[in-house]
Amino acid sequence: MRGMKYSLLAGAVLTLGALAGCSGFSYFVANVPASFGSFHRTRDLAYGSEARQRLDVYAPKDTAIHPLVVFFHGGSWTMGRKSQYAFMGAALATRGYITVIPDYRLYPEVRFPNFVEDSARAVAWVREHAQELRGDPDRIVLMGHSAGAHMAAMLALNSDYLERAGVPSYSIVGLVGLSGPYALDPNSDTLRTIFAVPYTEDDWRPVHFVTNRAPPTLLLHGLNDDVVSPTHTEKLRDALLSHGASVETHLYPGRGHADTAASFTLVARSRTPALQQTLAFLGRVTAQNDARTVAMNRRGMPGMTVRVPLTDSK
């Protein structure tokens, strides 16, 4: 009976939790455990004057200085909100990472590049307030799911956004992308409106901005993703490798678009080893206190791609 309940809960998250169709019930199930646990949560801190320029902070309860993770939610740049990813903040904060999840303005209120600029502004706020958060301003990892992974990659790979916001590139020590559209080709009327002239694919594709100065990167993607093709992850991986950047890639057979994020919830953690792989990566890239030294040593670090054989827990 206990196993059956677990399967039903996991199924609710995975069946109803695909990017564009996330139901209130699936998020409710995923986030119930995030209401408890050994972390502090602070909601709705303003990083700008607009209604959606707000962020939530999930922090370990101890008083030590911790690395910072800024996580951007998905939603096709048209929907989604930070509260839906409370499970992500809880999963990382209970493991020693101050996790900040911002909202950002969406279409039709804004178009590209305004939501990327909002994201840069949120990172700038995090760095400016790092001491108050008990975070290290020079150990920041950018992370996101789906559209949020696109924005995290844009910030990590195109330094102009963060530099204009006052964030030095050396403070970004890692990038984690879950199921992101890194070689975006707008294929609907809505997306063509969001990513419209005068901008072109050279402006909105993270793969276009890859250099040997890219931060160490972890890319996770389900091979059965029918929302964002895993070829996006493969193209970004190949671009990073061709420039001598450090990239670790995990491709999950039989897993879809929601699974990479759902694996951070208690009810669906067995879907992929994404949480364990992310924690291992975060541990490596944030271990060095001198972020400037980390930035100077990015070139020549090994890359790897793993197709992970998966077995569901019974």
Kindly give the residue locations of the regions a language model identified.
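N-terminal cap/lid segment of alpha/beta-hydrolase-fold proteins
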Residues: 24-63
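Primarily recognizes the serine-hydrolase "nucleophile elbow" in alpha/beta-hydrolase
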Residues: 121-190, 202
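Short beta-strand/loop motif that positions the catalytic acidic residue
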Residues: 219-221, 225
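Conserved alpha/beta-hydrolase "acid-adjacent" motif
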Residues: 226-235
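Short beta-strand element of the alpha/beta-hydrolase
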Residues: 65-75
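Catalytic nucleophile-loop/oxyanion-hole region of alpha/beta-hydrolase
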Residues: 80-84, 88, 100-137, 267-269
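Mobile cap/lid helix-loop segments that gate and shape the active-site cleft of serine hydrolases
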Residues: 34, 50, 177-209, 215
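C-terminal catalytic histidine-bearing segment of alpha/beta-hydrolase fold enzymes
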Residues: 234, 241-314
